[in-house]
Amino acid sequence: MRDWPDWREQIDAWQAPVLAREDLPERLRMALFNELYDLASGGSLWTAARPGDPVGRFGVLECFDYAWYESLDVRLYGSLALLQLWPELDKAVLRSFARAIPAADATPRPIGWYFTQGRGRVEAPRKRAAATPHDLGAPNESPFDATNYTAYQDCNLWKDLASDYVLQVWRTFLLSPNGEDLSFLAECWPAAVQALIYLKRFDVNHDGLPDNGGAPDQTFDDWPLQGVSAYCGALWIAALEAALAMAQRLQLDLGLNTAEEQHQFSGWLEQSRANFDRLLWNGEYYKIDAESGTPVVMADQLCGDFYARLLGLPSVVADERSRSSLNAVKEACFEGFEGGRLGVANGLCRDGMPLDPKGTHPLEVWTGINFGLAAYYRLMGDATTATAICSAVVNQVYGGGLQFRTPEAITAVKTYRACHYLRAMAIWALWATHTDWQLIPGAERAGSEG
């Protein structure tokens, strides 16, 4: 313990920028640091460095109930902490996905959701080549090598994972405190291209947008969507913008010929943009999907627009439609749900009533998605609603005895689900949007995590 004074000095310096921001509520400043507990007690795995892995391989469990590493749809939100504080570890995770995307594992597995629907045994291969895996595997197998551990849904069919991957690669290249790393971008580029081409196969009606298939096939994996959806469609458009930005940088700075990909992605993007609003805009907000007729306001309908704006890409939707949608979400899913006391519910009718009083995901408050939504409100200039949402969730977690085991979901009947959840570290999105990515001392030390 001879070095403890030096350690204490470094910890104080690390915390000082956050503690000094008196324009942030005190409880938010507290929670920013406390939510990092999951990196230490969330089942993290960190291997030794080796050729191709300069800081080793790294992964955090989605949670102990869903014990597989770095679920990609979840880390879209939750990895914003890792990006800002330990960016080389964030790159390590994305390199692991880059290796996993081309791989295949034909092992057949029964898909759990079909049993819950009384439809018997339906099997699917564990991992199709070019499909973006949901996760990097589980501790009871060979993580990083055997991916797609979860089998509740057939993740080869998910319509958000490829977009999630592309957005995270461009985000980490663009916003890492270590500066732009072209070798990292080049390493991930082939997998990003494969992932988008694979996802485009699900554009069944050739409108440029991948179609959801009716079984839950996105992060809300108990919530069926049909046809083009606001959630997956907006992510797709944002991912195409990110892929174009990648292609241009790689060609300009490294001389990589990406003309074919630029032409292809530009065509898809033009068609997607032409049809997204036409199919989904109802005059006030974006319909959950184009074909199910489900009359709910989905809280995270414009996650893709949030990410595009966060990364300085062209927005997915016009400012006035973003603000109109966010106002509908605020009235229906926040103020209309328990008076805003719990946070934002995932999906309610426009009058704040549940479509199905026995529903699961629509009636839950997802902590990490709430933090992401709060950051979106902040980006769009509504700091009051951003603070209100964040405060409601922090109060539920820390006032309800759930601190240091933050759940994925909280309900109005005082139940909760999936503690030690990775997505909740999305609270660091609020730091990014409020401070314009103010640097935390120590995060800029390239390669120092190893």
Per-range role (PLM):
Residues L196, R273, C390:
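Short amphipathic alpha-helical/adjacent loop interface patches that line ligand
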Residues L24-C63, A98, P102-N156, V204-G227, ...:
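Extended glycan-interaction surfaces of carbohydrate-active proteins
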Residues E9-D12, L19, P51, G118, ...:
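Intrinsically disordered, low-complexity regulatory segments enriched
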